[in-house]
Amino acid sequence: KVAVVERGAIVAMAPGVAKVLATVDGKMATLHVIVGKNQVPPISLRNEVIPVLSRQGCSSGACHGSPKGKGGFRLSLRGFDLSVDETTLRGEFFARRVSVLDPDSSLLLRKPLMHVPHAGGQRLHSDSVSHHVLRNWIVQGRQTDSAVAPRCVSLQIYPPSGRQLTRQAPNQQFV
């Protein structure tokens, strides 16, 4: 796949050309997407992998983010301690939990897809961006971030005055 669309966002997955067709209220628009070889950066452990695990609930206190983890797998609570998570995710070389030799056999992918029993239930779908992030990080060799990797230094939410829902608009768009 060149790109995937999830929740309205187009995410580059591999070099190539794709066409995206969007329809809303009977109106259609077509967008041509070109992903070049240099446009697919390595998956970031800090900025992508850890947030995926947090978003899926894996690093919550009720799951692997608890002080002792679950099932021998421990993550820091909500991804707070990158060194703990890095040790857990990268420390088992040639292990079954995260296998660079056969990424699809990694328990990090198989359990949340429910390919093997998982007490936490299904947390991923094979066509989701979250699954692609985790799988591609493993395929790329479970690399840690370089010293020059981008870091989030601030976050601004718009509108700045906060939530402004009205009865006619039950959802609020934040940018």
Regions found by a protein language model. Name each.
Residues K1-V175:
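Aromatic- and Gly/Pro-enriched helix-to-coil junctions and flexible linker segments
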